[in-house]
A protein has these predicted regions:
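Rossmann-fold NAD(P)H-dependent dehydrogenase/reductase core
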Residues: 1-94
C-alpha cells in the first residue's frame, strides 16, 4: 500500500485500483476459457481485512462516484483506494 499523492494511469484510473483489482480481474477473464476447458482449474483471489473499511462489516460504503478519490486530496485517499481495491476483489470472487 502506498502513501502520498494519488497517481492516475493513462486510462484515468488510480494505480492502486488498477494494480490490485483491475489487472487480476482482466487476467482472470482472459484466462477463463482455458481454465474452464482444463476442467480442474481453480481461481484463487487474495484480499485483505482492509476491505471491511468499505461497508461489508461496518465502515464507509464503496463510493462508485468517486472510485479514484479524485475529490479527496487528504493523505488518507490512497488508503481508501487500497480498501476499495480489496473490497472489489471480494465482490469479484462472489
Amino acid at each position: 500500500m502506498r502513501t502520498g499523492k494519488s497517481h492516475l494511469s493513462a486510462d484515468g484510473l488510480e494505480y492502486v485500483t488498477q494494480c490490485n483489482h483491475l489487472a487480476p480481474f482482466l487476467l482472470t477473464n482472459l484466462l477463463l476459457p482455458r481454465l474452464a476447458a482444463a476442467g480442474t482449474a481453480r481461481v484463487v483471489n487474495v484480499s485483505s481485512i482492509a476491505a471491511i473499511r468499505n461497508g461489508l462489516i461496518g465502515w464507509a460504503p464503496l463510493d462508485m462516484d468517486n472510485i479514484n478519490y479524485a475529490k479527496d486530496h487528504s493523505p488518507q485517499a490512497l488508503m481508501y483506494a487500497y480498501h476499495n481495491s480489496k473490497l472489489m476483489n471480494i465482490l469479484f470472487t462472489y
